[in-house]
A protein has these predicted regions:
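Catalytic phosphate/metal-binding cores of nucleic-acid and nucleotide-processing enzymes, i.e., regions
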Residues: 1-115
């Protein structure tokens, strides 16, 4: 599937309130942590199509990676797997986080080894 086909087939997601609250419990603290470490964890609403990762993390020096936040043990959806493959094929790093504190450890490692 081409990039344009993926973007045209994808539609905006509407998560249930319970899912948003559970994801916010992990996602929002990570965003604050990223800020404290000189990075930005952006939710790209223009690109927020079904399957696109939850956060695009931009760091000093032009370093970028993507994070998908999931409930513990929940696998990626089919469109998320397509987006993951697309981003990896362009050379970006892509992570799936399903535990509190996991994204913070990923950011620490990314900053330590990408300089």
């Amino acid at each position: 599937m081409s990039t344009s086909e993926f973007l045209s087939r994808a539609s905006k997601t509407k998560a249930k309130a319970s899912e948003i609250k559970e994801k916010d419990d992990v996602e929002l603290p990570f965003c604050k942590y990223a800020e404290r470490n000189g990075c930005k964890a952006l939710k790209l609403t223009y690109l927020r199509k079904k399957g696109f990762p939850d956060r695009t993390v931009i760091c000093p020096g032009g370093k970028v990676f993507f994070i998908e936040f999931k409930r513990p043990g929940k696998p990626l959806e089919p469109l998320q797997k397509i987006a993951q493959s697309l981003l990896l094929s362009f050379g970006f790093e892509y992570y799936v986080c399903d535990q509190p504190g996991q994204a913070e450890k990923i950011l620490d490692n990314f900053l330590a080894f990408s300089s």
